[in-house]
Amino acid sequence: MAVTMADITKLRKMSGAGMMDCKKALTESDGDIEKAMEIIRKKGQAIAAKRSDREAAEGCVLAKKDGEFAAIIALKCETDFVAKNEDFVALTQAILDAAVANKCRTLDEVKALPMGKGTIQEAVTDRSGITGEKMELDGYCVVEGAYTTVYNHMGKNQLCTIAAFNKESEEAAHNIVMQIAAMNPIAIDEAGVPESVKEKEIQVAIEKTKAEQVQKAVEAALKKAGINPSHVDSEAHMESNMDKGWITAEDVAKAKEIIATVSAEKAANLPQQMIENIAKGRLGKFLKEVCLLNQEDIMDGKKTVRETMKEIDPELQILAFKRFTLRAE
């Protein structure tokens, strides 16, 4: 049976495959559209399998709400060209629509939903085969509450945020999802920050404070000996500054002795209570930066998010939020 241009065009619209692939599939199936579709699907699955070890760093991130339920999903691919393709964005939207309509709470539930003649996962695999790029679903997260809101940062499908509240407040809700997008908090308040994170931060703060105290003592001792600390702060600088004639070999030897002696003495005699107090202050600063309600309001730098919410509605509470981006931060 001869393959017509009308059949090729029809198959291309149905499958999204290229003209030549459609022609080959129709020729192989003797003009049978359904069989040609299956040939294209199988070929696409084989191509997708070969690309499974590639990195999918680009993609499309979308968010949607339906009453008390809101979700984010990302369909990832390899190139920005595919990520901005209308069919790719439409597929991402269709997947999100299905996920929200079915109130899916896990990515596995989303993948198992029906789409076309198979599942959503199979639809993604089919599209991967057609484009020749690795594709995978990622970033699926949900929030639930009396009122939900979503935000797609600058409409670029790269960063989305969602949040749930105990009651409706459109103005506050919109400002907060923008705040989450801009400031990337890890918790609503201090209670939501895992103890393991707090413990890690306090240890980092303690070690940093100790190092700073030792460094101050070393610099003071070097200056007292008539040596510029910046000239001897590394082996490379010592060599370079000797070549320039800024310091002598004797200066370097003396500096090394001072650095070793003072560092050891200061480290052994650091005031523990002072170190802990400084570290606690740094932990407090960290918690202010990573807790949403403690953050400086991006819309009004003179207030915290908590203060702004209280002004808008004293009874308003944020129950949960999620944020997903394809970009490293």
UniProtKB/Swiss-Prot annotation:
Compartments where located: Cytoplasm
Pfam families: EF_TS (PF00889)
Transmembrane segments: none
Ranges for region Involved in Mg(2+) ion dislocation from EF-Tu: 79-82
GO terms for MF: translation elongation factor activity
Primary residence: cytoplasm
Keywords (A to Z) from UniProt: Cytoplasm, Elongation factor, Protein biosynthesis
InterPro entries: EF-Ts_dimer_sf, Transl_elong_EFTs/EF1B, Transl_elong_EFTs/EF1B_dimer, Transl_elong_Ts_CS, UBA-like_sf
Superkingdom, taxonomy of origin: Bacteria
Cellular compartments per GO CC: cytoplasm
Record-linked PROSITE patterns: EF_TS_1, EF_TS_2
Family assignment from sequence similarity: Belongs to the EF-Ts family.
Known role: Associates with the EF-Tu.GDP complex and induces the exchange of GDP to GTP. It remains bound to the aminoacyl-tRNA.EF-Tu.GTP complex up to the GTP hydrolysis stage on the ribosome.
Protein name from the UniProt record: Elongation factor Ts
Gene: tsf
